[in-house]
UniProtKB/Swiss-Prot annotation:
It comes from Methanopyrus kandleri (strain AV19 / DSM 6324 / JCM 9639 / NBRC 100938). The keyword Nuclease does not apply. NCBIfam families: ksgA (TIGR00755). It is found in: Cytoplasm. This is Probable ribosomal RNA small subunit methyltransferase A. One of its GO terms (molecular function) is rRNA (adenine-N6,N6-)-dimethyltransferase activity.
Length: 278
């Protein structure tokens, strides 16, 4: 049964309606659902996490390929439908939980999901803390484009830097609004995240990196020196300490503009600041 027909069957049987406050838009395009599973190279020895499965449209595809699927859903109505319709499958575990508070099992090695767009950022960074092989996710198109933006471009941002320091990011394809019921207000994109190993990640405290990055991109068109001074509260005790630290940093780095700094240079700057702060 095609996904659009399966959803119609569920709506007729259970009277379900998507809840916009939970960011529910159900993908019914079977070509894209299959594409996502293929992009993650889901195999029978994989344990796959799905975030926000809703009525189980993507879940059905994952179940045919994965050794185990763990579907984490916040909406109690959807959990009951999943249990009634798919719950007897031996390789499906249905969990009612807020993913942001959920303790992901250590043996999960892949994530495939159409995530709620209103919490895309916290979901992404939680996933990048996990020891997984790959995540294939659907994002709002504008968010996805920021993730892969080039230094100097209008969409280059703190998000770009932080994500690219932690993972290899690939924008795989666009998704039209009509692929969902109800259609979201904007287009979407499928993105593949391949987390970097510990050796590939920057050798700097994550909190320092985040605070420096936040300071830089609050004033991304100013020089690095001015951006760090204007947002000294983000990374230093006060402006006096900030000035002392800046005296120890390379002038060529301070005269750059955050908008043009590649992620690796931002990490280099954060490491230098961390060292100067002691």
């Amino acid at each position: 049964m095609r996904s659009v027909e399966y959803l119609a069957y569920l709506r007729s049987k259970y009277g379900i309606r998507p809840r916009r406050r939970l960011g529910q838009h159900f993908m019914v395009d079977d070509n894209i659902l299959e594409f996502m599973v293929e992009a993650a190279e889901v195999r029978e020895d994989d344990i796959v996490l799905e975030i926000g499965p809703g009525p189980g449209l993507l879940t059905r595809y994952l179940m045919t390929r994965a050794g185990q699927v763990i579907a984490v859903e916040l909406d109690g109505r959807m959990v009951e439908i999943l249990k009634r319709e798919l719950g007897e499958a031996p390789n499906l575990e249905i969990v009612r939980a807020d993913f942001l508070e959920y303790d992901v099992p250590d043996d999960v090695n892949k994530v495939v999901a159409n995530i709620p767009y209103n919490i895309s950022s916290p979901i992404t960074f939680k996933l990048l803390e996990l020891d997984i092989d790959v995540a294939v996710l659907t994002y709002q198109r504008e968010f996805a484009e920021r993730m892969v933006a080039e230094p100097g471009s209008k969409k280059y941002s703190r998000l770009t830097v932080m994500v690219n320091l932690l993972a290899d990011v690939e924008l795989l394809r666009g998704v039209p609004r009509r692929a969902f019921i109800p259609p979201p207000r904007v287009g979407s994109s499928v993105v593949r995240l391949t987390p970097k190993s510990e050796e590939e990640r920057p050798d700097v405290d994550p909190d320092t990196l985040e605070s420096v990055c936040r300071a830089l991109f609050q004033h991304k068109n100013k020089t690095v020196r001015n951006a760090l001074l204007l947002s000294a509260h983000e990374w230093a005790t006060d402006r006096e300490q900030a000035r002392e630290v800046l005296e120890e940093l390379p002038e060529d780095l301070l005269s750059e503009r955050p908008l043009h700094l590649p992620p690796e240079r931002v990490a280099e700057l954060a490491a230098a600041i961390e060292s100067a702060l002691g």
